[in-house]
Every structure is written in C-alpha cells, then in structure tokens.
C-alpha cells in the first residue's frame, strides 16, 4: 500500500489561497487525491487503494501542483510512503486507558 503525506505552511497558505478560508485548501486536496484512488486517513495523510502504485503517487502530486497554483509555494514537505503492514495501535491505547472492548 502507498501513502502520500504532506505539510502545508499555513502562513503562506493564508497569503496564496484565493478562497475565504485557507482551510478549504485541505478539502481541495482531498477531492483531487480521491480522483487518483486515495482515501483520507488523518490530518494530511492519504492512503492509496489497491490500484495505487508509485506511478499513481507521482501523477497525483504532479496534478496537485498543476491544478492549484497555491500548492507548490505552500507545501513544506511531501512524501510518498510504502506501507508494508497496516497495524492499528488504537487497541493498545484503549487498553491502557481502560476503554473499549
């Protein structure tokens, strides 16, 4: 499984993003990545579906940079990750906190 994770400079985003709220930029990114088969996981982390490969990741990032003129100047860091195993650690947290099943 592949993932894309990124960090946007919110100060620059306020200056470059044309909409009323710079927070709308995250929804724009979510919609664009959805078109390439990515699902929002948390924050600025998107997991690719079964058909997403390394090439799809590169094409998706190229699309973001071309589609949104505010993207390139505001992105501080962006990574493609390959996830070998999907391990949910929430049961550990819940057990320590005494909550959950």
Where are these regions (language model features)?
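Basic nucleic-acid-binding interfaces
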Residues: 2-3, 11-101
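Active-site flanking residues adjacent to catalytic metal/cofactor-binding acidic residues
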Residues: 6
């Amino acid at each position: 499984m592949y993932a894309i994770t990124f960090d946007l400079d919110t100060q620059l985003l306020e200056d470059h993003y044309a909409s009323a709220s710079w927070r709308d930029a995250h929804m724009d990114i979510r919609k664009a990545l959805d078109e390439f088969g990515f699902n929002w996981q948390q924050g600025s982390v998107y997991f690719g579906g079964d058909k997403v490969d390394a090439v799809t990741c590169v094409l998706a990032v190229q699309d973001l940079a071309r589609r949104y003129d505010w993207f390139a100047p505001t992105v501080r860091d962006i990574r493609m990750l390959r996830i070998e195993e999907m391990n949910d650690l929430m049961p550990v947290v819940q057990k320590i906190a005494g909550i959950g099943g």
